[in-house]
């Protein structure tokens, strides 16, 4: 187990509910890590107010402020550099992470997706599950690679899909499971208990 706290960056585009669950788990000592900076691509996102209450530096990096994808991605790298982060946590970050960030932080970027990958990647995972007629769906915490929700899977948990489910009801049922799963996966990451071999993530007992 690593004794020193992992220095983590939180990337979020929305209200930051998963980020809040992780932050609380850190404050309670369950996760041996700390958010040292928050990056958002929306200056009016709910995570902005959360960052103030947490007293964590927030940096707004919006794609529209940059002439090119390359300059936008370089701005992300430049923003992170002073904080010397050990890992990046994506929590409702709605942009595809570019190659420069993935290469710089290989196997150190975590994401949560509201479906049982490799099924139903991309947007609207809840609705995809309903439309697909599956009886069970869930969430997946995975390392980020260059594909769309294709990185090595760390952990998954499930919920039933009910006959009368809507995207909203299924999302509400899954959200607390997302919080639980992400907290456990990040705890393992911060304790250096995850090893990647090919496509498989092994968890140290």
Regions found by a protein language model. Give the residues of each.
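N-terminal Rossmann-like dinucleotide-binding module
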Residues: 2-46, 50
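Short, basic/aromatic-enriched C-terminal tail that caps enzymatic domains
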Residues: 20, 196-205
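Amphipathic, non-transmembrane alpha-helical secondary structure
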Residues: 20-24, 49, 74-81, 183
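Donor/substrate-binding cores of folate-linked one-carbon enzymes
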Residues: 25, 41, 87-200
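Conserved beta-strand segments of alpha/beta enzyme cores
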Residues: 34-37, 57-59, 108
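Short, structured coil segments at secondary-structure junctions
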Residues: 54-55, 105
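Short beta->alpha connector loops at strand-helix junctions that form conserved
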Residues: 59-64, 112
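Glycine/small-residue-rich loop that forms an oxyanion/phosphate-binding "nest" at active or ligand-binding sites
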Residues: 60, 67-85
